């Protein structure tokens, strides 16, 4: 064993943290960063600096390095790759020993990987593109409270995606009128309705009143339709204590599902709530409010695929993923990539979808992908083709904006979905034949016919800001 000696002073990061010969261990946590270095900082030094500042390093040599095994604990930048079509930045791959992170703590992982290093002066911009969580770490995490199959069993819904609706206007309704809208949507044929992400406990809709009126709506709709129904009651609150109080009250009302804003609420609160949901048999819907602040800039922040992985580890049965076809940002290949990362047991590296590493989830349950944001009945064929069955198509204006009212909007959604599922099962090409499928179904559904006429001109044809830049690696 080499004798450790201490030499005070500052040395290049590459001397300690650049290790191109390193072969990552199966137990390492691997990260891919997109780095835009400051002028005059070369790639190897910038990559090594990121590895250092996100693991054991600081700006100068310290004598306490001698008190531990730095060679074991340090992060290592082990590979650099070009970003296709952009010579101002590059990809740096960093390996971290698993012992750097607390077991089952997404909070601790993010504190290191996206902590102070993102303010480091040596880099002009920094983005965490992907993380490989080793199976050894996955097994320490709580994961989804129930998962896809258990939810299907609880809700008695099989062979198709589920349908939801976010109640609008998102703010301003009284609890009584809110409950009325919930009832009409569920009675019309939807499986779920939803609180908008910013519905918490405002003066006009105190949370307890909302819960009571919603519970009455759900129980009435279930009795009249013979179907299991649910509403995502948002329990996000100013403090964990209040969050759990709201969750407990939802359970007392026999509500099947609650909701949390996982980014604004925080990973600590989310992990705790997911554990509570598993213990108490309550499903957990997750909204991603604030995500675009973090993930939309293609050069700085955290890619959504990383946030999706983190949510699966922290815990949630549903997660909003974008729609590809609606009003929100979402590249098709990238979206299908992170949808697979939410649902599948193993997802291989796939440059064409922006997936930088193999990801093995072991037996961790999957998460329903929620397609929400500017969708209507004309989108149904594409939604089913893109997302498949293990998804929730979450309408808002596409239900509540129907000329004949909420129940008619829900009926139109249900008829459109069932027509597309039947056509898919017959082997028809949904995206090529979608118009014919819907117009034929509308012959027996006046609600769908009016919906198709109402939204026939509505499109959201804006270019994607965060495009895949990984083509061939």
From Swiss-Prot:
The positions annotated for binding substrate are 116, 166, 170, 288, 320, 372
One GO biological-process annotation of the entry reads:
reductive pentose-phosphate cycle
Residue numbers carrying N6-carboxylysine: 194
UniProt lineage:
Bacteria, Pseudomonadati, Pseudomonadota, Acidithiobacillia, Acidithiobacillales
Q: What class of enzyme is it?
A: lyase
Protein name as catalogued: Ribulose bisphosphate carboxylase large chain 1
Provide the residue positions that the database annotates as binding Mg(2+): 194, 196-197
A Pfam family found in this protein is RuBisCO_large_N
What other note does the entry give for this protein?
The basic functional RuBisCO is composed of a large chain homodimer in a 'head-to-tail' conformation. In form I RuBisCO this homodimer is arranged in a barrel-like tetramer with the small subunits forming a tetrameric 'cap' on each end of the 'barrel'.
Q: Which InterPro entries match?
A: RuBisCO, RuBisCo_large_chain_AS, RuBisCO_lsu_C, RuBisCO_lsu_C_sf, RuBisCO_lsu_fd_N, RuBisCO_lsu_N_sf, RuBisCO_lsuI
Query: Per the record, where is site Transition state stabilizer?
Result: 327
Give the protein's biological function: RuBisCO catalyzes two reactions: the carboxylation of D-ribulose 1,5-bisphosphate, the primary event in carbon dioxide fixation, as well as the oxidative fragmentation of the pentose substrate. Both reactions occur simultaneously and in competition at the same active site.
User: Record's HAMAP family?
Assistant: RuBisCO_L_type1
A GO molecular function annotation here is: ribulose-bisphosphate carboxylase activity
What is the active site of this protein? 168, 287
UniProt keyword terms in alphabetical order:
Calvin cycle, Carbon dioxide fixation, Lyase, Magnesium, Metal-binding, Monooxygenase, Oxidoreductase
- What's the family? Belongs to the RuBisCO large chain family. Type I subfamily.
The cofactors required by this protein are: Mg(2+)
Q: How is the cofactor bound?
A: Binds 1 Mg(2+) ion per subunit.
Report which reactions are catalysed by this protein: 2 (2R)-3-phosphoglycerate + 2 H(+) = D-ribulose 1,5-bisphosphate + CO2 + H2O; D-ribulose 1,5-bisphosphate + O2 = 2-phosphoglycolate + (2R)-3-phosphoglycerate + 2 H(+)
Q: What is its EC number?
A: 4.1.1.39
Q: How does it assemble?
A: Heterohexadecamer of 8 large chains and 8 small chains.
């Amino acid at each position: 064993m080499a004798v450790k000696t201490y030499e005070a002073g500052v040395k290049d990061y590459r001397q300690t943290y650049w290790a191109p010969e390193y072969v990552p261990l199966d137990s390492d946590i691997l990260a891919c960063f997109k780095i835009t270095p400051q002028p005059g900082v070369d790639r190897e030094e910038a990559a090594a600096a990121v590895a250092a500042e996100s693991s054991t390093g600081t700006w100068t040599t310290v004598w306490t390095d001698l008190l531990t095994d730095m060679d074991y604990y340090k992060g290592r930048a082990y590979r650099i790759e070009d970003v296709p079509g952009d010579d101002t930045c590059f990809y740096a791959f960093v390996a971290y020993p698993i012992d750097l992170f607390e077991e089952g703590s997404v909070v601790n992982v993010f504190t290191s990987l996206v902590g102070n290093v993102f303010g480091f002066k040596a880099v002009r911009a920094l983005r965490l593109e992907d993380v490989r969580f080793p199976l050894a770490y996955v097994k320490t995490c709580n994961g989804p409270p129930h998962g896809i199959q258990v939810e299907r069993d609880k809700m008695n819904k099989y062979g198709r995606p589920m349908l939801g609706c976010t109640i609008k206007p998102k703010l301003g309704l009284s609890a009584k009128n809110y409950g009325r809208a919930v009832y009409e949507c569920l009675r019309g044929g939807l499986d779920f309705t939803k609180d908008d992400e910013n519905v918490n406990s405002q003066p006009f809709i105190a949370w307890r009143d909302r819960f009571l009126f919603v519970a009455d709506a759900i129980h009435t709709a279930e009795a009249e339709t013979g179907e299991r129904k649910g509403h995502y009651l948002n329990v996000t609150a100013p403090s964990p204590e209040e969050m759990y109080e709201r969750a407990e009250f939802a359970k007392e009302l026999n509500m099947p599902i609650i909701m949390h804003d996982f980014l604004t609420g925080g990973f600590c609160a989310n992990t705790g709530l997911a554990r509570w949901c598993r213990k108490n048999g309550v499903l957990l819907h997750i909204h991603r409010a604030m995500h675009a602040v973090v993930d939309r800039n293609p050069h700085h922040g955290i890619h959504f695929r990383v946030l999706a992985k983190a949510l699966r580890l922290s815990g949630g049965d549903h997660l909003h993923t974008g729609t590809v076809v609606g009003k929100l940002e979402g590249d098709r290949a990238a979206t299908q990539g992170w949808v697979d990362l939410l649902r599948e047991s193993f997802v291989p590296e796939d440059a064409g979808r922006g997936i930088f590493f193999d990801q093995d989830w072991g037996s961790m349950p999957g998460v329903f992908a929620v397609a929400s944001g500017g969708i209507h009945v004309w989108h149904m064929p594409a939604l089913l083709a893109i997302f498949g069955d293990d998804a929730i198509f979450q309408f808002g204006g596409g239900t509540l904006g129907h000329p004949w009212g909420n129940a008619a909007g829900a009926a139109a959604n249900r008829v459109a979905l069932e027509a597309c599922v039947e056509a898919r099962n017959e082997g028809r090409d949904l995206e090529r034949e979608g118009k014919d499928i819907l117009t034929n179904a509308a012959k027996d559904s006046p609600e769908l016919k009016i919906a198709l006429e109402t939204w026939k001109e509505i499109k959201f044809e804006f270019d994607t800001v965060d495009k895949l830049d990984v083509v061939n690696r």
